[in-house]
Amino acid sequence: MRVLIAGLLLAMVGPSLAAGIVVTDGDTFQLDHTTYRLDGIDAPEIDQTCLDQSGDVWPCGVTARDRLSAYIGNRAVRCEDKGPDPVYKHRRIGICSIESEATTLNEWLVREGWAIKFEPSAKGRFAAEEADARVNRRGLWQGCFAEPRDLRRWNLNGARLIGGGCQAGHENRTRVKLFRVDTAMPPGCPIKAKLALRAVGYEGIYHLPSCGSYRRVKRANRWFCSEEDALAEGFRKALTCR
């Protein structure tokens, strides 16, 4: 078992920063030189939007990240390293907690409604925490949202809509709101990404601000804070960046 301990401070703009730590979204952060994704849960992507209880769009991905940062504050965090991320080998899977607390960050995020359990890696864990958040409409559950995995796949037509604010019979209209191609850039996340439909499915291409194609991309499907984030979701760099 590998254990890392570090302090985490809240930052209000861009990725949350502290000495040796960067929080990129609601379930991923870097401790020293190791990037951890929290085991068994799935938080909104940093550029993901959700609908609130009134049906209005709000930046739930940024909010989930900021709530995690605020919860930790300046307290020390411990991460138990569970091995490499099967999706992106440069990241590690972690079960993390504030050093003096028994509740893990994984559990806290699901219980407070800022993440959902992620099967099959959850292996049945976090069901009680998710049920509690759903019944009490905490966090994401107050409105309507798509599972983060569906956003990553850009599963516009088949995305599962969940939350207390989802309206039966309005699924198509809701999906159009949630899968937007004009989403505003999250603070500190300037990398534009487009999805192109190919015979084998969608291909994701990202454009750095230094790329010749950057200004020509007017309507981005996705935004990323770093190249690592884009690569972790299967996007490739635009040819104009080479």
Cite the ranges covered by each PLM segment.
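N-terminal signal peptide c-region/cleavage motif recognized by signal peptidases
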Residues: 13-15
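Bulky hydrophobic/aromatic "packing anchor" residues in well-ordered structure
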Residues: 38, 109, 133, 206-207
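Structured segments of extracytoplasmic/periplasmic soluble domains
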Residues: 44, 67-75, 112-116, 129-132, ...
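Short, surface-exposed secondary-structure junctions/capping segments
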Residues: 48-60, 119-138
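Stable alpha-helical elements in mature extracytoplasmic
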Residues: 64-68, 101, 105, 110, ...
